[in-house]
Amino acid sequence: MSSTDDKPRKVQKTEAEWRAQLDPMQFEVTRHGATERAFTGKYADHWQEGVYHCVGCNAPLFDSGTKFDAGCGWPSYFQPLRGEIIDRVVDRSHGMVRVEVRCQDCGAHLGHVFPDGPEPTGERYCINSASLGFEPRK
């Protein structure tokens, strides 16, 4: 687990390119590490079957079958589709030590992972809706 985002990414864009692609909330969350307010994101209470993907690069991140209601106001999942698609980064902001999760392909801030999730992993990936897109299962 690293403490900085210094690794090369598959998808690299300028700030202007990210701003043109993303809406203002998506940009602040994914590129500056902001957090949307609890219970306001479009996927907080979304239960359709399918795959949630990175809004920045479309990398598939979470299957709807791993989503659960954590009662926290953000979409929560107990595991990513593939462990290697998520980077874990030590986050020491706001006087806390947490584990930030980012998209490995484009470096988008997704949210944080906590050790209080359900079986089988015991982890809770607490993810901002603004960092996600969704593809329904066919």
Swiss-Prot record:
Its EC number is 1.8.4.12. It comes from the Bacteria. Coiled coil: none annotated. Binds 1 zinc ion per subunit. The zinc ion is important for the structural integrity of the protein. Belongs to the MsrB Met sulfoxide reductase family. PANTHER family: METHIONINE SULFOXIDE REDUCTASE, METHIONINE-R-SULFOXIDE REDUCTASE B1. This is Peptide methionine sulfoxide reductase MsrB. The gene is msrB.
